[in-house]
Regions:
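N-terminal hydrophobic targeting/anchoring segments and the immediately downstream early-domain regions
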Residues: 2-186, 236, 240-392
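Catalytic beta/alpha-barrel core
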Residues: 118-121, 205-212
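Short, contiguous, pocket-lining structural segments
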Residues: 185-192, 208-216, 245
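Surface-exposed cleft-lining segments at the edges of enzyme active sites
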Residues: 203-206, 308-309
Length: 392
């Protein structure tokens, strides 16, 4: 089980042995992150036009307003990123389809704008080649099944455009799948929801079970013929939050072959932050506002006179990583930071430059470099290959 540190590894000098080992390791192996919301953050700066969004901020210099830019990514040793083509649940039907296509184009624009930094890839082999050439292998992940507007045709189009996974829900239920942060409506997946999972298997699109209800997780794993992923979730047993993964589901991953990519979101990893968020949710409900609407939540908290928000730490994230390893096994874990998808990240993991700090902490706790390499990206690449092998 997880034991507390006697100190904070992120406060130690950058020259410490563990951090040097972590940096050297991440120079040699692909570090893959399952979820980054930079495309939507750029839309917030530049508007819905993908060209203007991609050009709204110069990512070659440090951007204090962002968790992600190329100097930070270089320091963080990131080798492979699933860029989220996220669409808020407020978009429905045709507007959701339009928005997700715009977000796909934002990523394409970024790759064209920064060809010396990014390379658009769709396979594990292409990702490894991009890494060898000094580029960040860039893949796309759709967040929220509402973005296909109940159309298998739209799902197939997204895959044709390079989208490699789809999160079955976001914060609200779809008409065919239950979300973890909504009231149960379907008992997990409807028959159409099961058809969506089967079609994703067929076309080589990974089934992402972050955000969904445990009943949906179990149903999707039962239906899926290939490994599933959780692109950015943590462990319910460590912090009982509806966005996390119960132990019985983690225990299914060795049989399924899937990967739980542990996230850094403070409310998901820290019980103290989760309790603070419950107070915020209650205050918003009293004011007649919807907590699950991320835009409304951000505005509300600016003027809220509630208690100060507690801080999550690297130690909190380590607790989830080690619990997932204990229950699912070392071959079934990865990382999905959710950078630029939340306002702040834990101390020591504040932005995308900080990945080596996490690996230094794990090395200090006795992790082998081989196990760190599996967590970093080897497991995720295996799943990508298995999904593609079934589709072919």
């Amino acid at each position: 089980m997880y034991e507390s540190y006697t100190g904070h590894p992120y406060d130690r000098p950058m020259t410490n042995e563990a951090l040097q080992r972590a940096t050297k390791l991440l120079d040699a192996v692909i570090l893959a992150d399952g979820h980054n919301d930079l495309p939507w953050e750029l839309r917030q700066h530049g508007g819905p036009n993908p060209v203007e969004a991609a050009a709204s901020l110069d990512l070659t210099v440090r951007q204090p307003a962002l968790h992600t830019d190329f100097p930070k990514l270089a320091d963080g040793k990131l080798g492979m990123q699933f860029w989220s083509v996220y669409v808020p649940c407020e978009f429905e039907g045709h507007s959701a389809v339009t928005a997700v296509l715009e977000q796909v184009e934002v990523v394409h624009q970024l790759v064209e704008r920064y060809p010396d930094r990014l390379r658009l890839v769709t396979t594990a082999d292409e990702a490894e080649a991009a890494f060898a050439d000094g580029r960040i292998a860039s893949l796309l992940g759709a967040e929220g099944g509402h973005s296909i507007a109940e159309s298998i045709g739209v799902l197939r189009i997204l895959r044709r455009l390079g989208v490699r996974y789809m999160t079955l829900t976001h914060n609200f239920n779809t008409t065919w799948a239950d979300a973890g942060t909504d009231e149960p409506a379907h008992g997990g997946l409807t028959e159409f929801g099961r058809d969506v999972v089967r079609e994703m298997n067929k076309i080589g699109m990974m089934v992402d079970l972050s955000h969904v209800a445990p009943s949906t997780m179990r149903a999707a794993i039962e239906v899926s013929s290939v490994p599933v992923i959780f692109s950015h979730s943590s462990c319910t047993a460590v912090n009982d939050h509806p966005r996390n993964i119960p132990d019985d589901v983690l225990a299914k991953l060795p049989g399924n072959g899937g990967v739980a990519m542990i996230t850094f979101v403070p409310a998901f990893v820290s019980p103290k932050v989760a309790a603070w968020n419950e107070q915020l949710e209650a205050a918003m409900a009293e004011a007649g506002q919807e907590y699950r609407n991320l835009t409304l939540r951000g505005k509300f908290v600016q003027d809220w006179d509630g208690p100060p928000k507690p801080l999550a730490t690297v130690e909190d994230v380590v607790a989830h990583v080690e619990h997932a390893r204990e229950v699912a096994g070392i071959d079934h874990i990865g990382l999905g930071g959710d950078y630029d998808g939340v306002g702040s990240l834990p101390e020591g993991l504040e932005d995308t430059s900080k990945y080596p700090v996490l690996f230094a902490a794990l090395l200090e706790r006795g992790w082998s470099e081989d196990d760190c390499a599996k967590l970093a990206g080897r497991n995720t690449l295996r799943v990508l290959r298995e999904v593609d092998g079934f589709a072919r």
